[in-house]
A protein has these predicted regions:
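Nucleotide-binding/hydrolysis machinery
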Residues: 4, 11, 18, 22-24, ...
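Conserved post-Walker A coupling segment in P-loop NTPases
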Residues: 24, 37-102, 113-129, 194-199
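Amphipathic alpha-helical protein-protein interaction surfaces
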Residues: 31, 44-47, 141, 177
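Short, conserved clusters of charged catalytic residues that mark active-site
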Residues: 33-34, 104-107, 120, 163
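Helical "lid/switch" subdomain of P-loop NTPase nucleotide-binding domains
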Residues: 62, 87-91, 96-99, 104-111, ...
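Loop/turn-to-beta-strand initiation segments
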Residues: 116-119, 135, 156-161
Length: 200
């Protein structure tokens, strides 16, 4: 039975390595094999994951690997660095009808609501503005949130995977990123090596 389980494990890891290759990620090195094994292990828990690494190393692919191993639908991704703060907030939290000028008359569901029991991938988390750092920390602590303009709390059941190419430890020391949020995100730390370090 153990031998069969080991064969199945190797097969699933190889499937993930092929997935890396499909996305032009060099995936046959020992380092990437270890990452595939790590993705399998962390797929069975709901803890928050913080993925670090240079731009283009495949942080989003690692998130997809977690989803595949867990047998869950693909994640909902949002980049924290590409949107103005007010728009990013409404995308994450949603809003009630008439919450602000120009708001949809029927309101809007945000990513925390749309994700359900799935996975939210917060890319470029190091770009998150200070006010939203506070709000995200509260969501992770309480596992609930409020739509903009809302008074009724809503459950946040999704798993959060965050990614950055920045040195968040350094930014915590400098005071530009909240220490408490960093520790909430960094429950399972994953560092993806740069391409130049992936020897076959």
């Amino acid at each position: 039975v153990k031998e069969k389980a080991n064969r199945e494990l190797v097969q699933r890891i190889n499937e993930m390595l092929h997935l890396m290759e499909d996305y032009d990620i060099v995936g046959r090195s020992k380092a990437m094999h270890n990452l595939a094994e790590l993705a399998l292990r962390v797929s069975h828990v709901r803890s928050t994951v913080l993925i670090t690494g240079e731009s283009g190393v495949g942080k989003d692919v690692f998130c997809r690997m977690i989803c595949r191993f867990a047998g869950s639908p693909d994640y909902i991704k949002i980049s924290c660095g590409n949107l103005p703060e007010n728009l990013l907030e409404s995308e994450l939290f949603g809003y009630e009808a008439g919450a602000f000028t120009g708001a949809n008359r029927t309101g809007k569901r945000g990513i925390f609501e749309l994700a359900g029991d799935g996975v939210i991938f917060l890319d470029e988390i190091g770009e998150l503005p200070p006010q939203l750092q506070v709000k995200l920390l509260t969501v992770l602590q309480d596992r609930r949130f409020y739509r903009i303009g809302g008074t009724a709390p809503l459950p946040m059941n999704a798993r959060v995977v965050a990614a950055t190419n920045r040195d968040l430890k350094k930014e915590v020391a400098q005071g530009s990123f909240r220490r408490d949020l960093y520790y909430r995100l960094n429950v399972i730390p994953v560092h993806i090596p740069p391409l130049r370090e992936r020897t076959e």
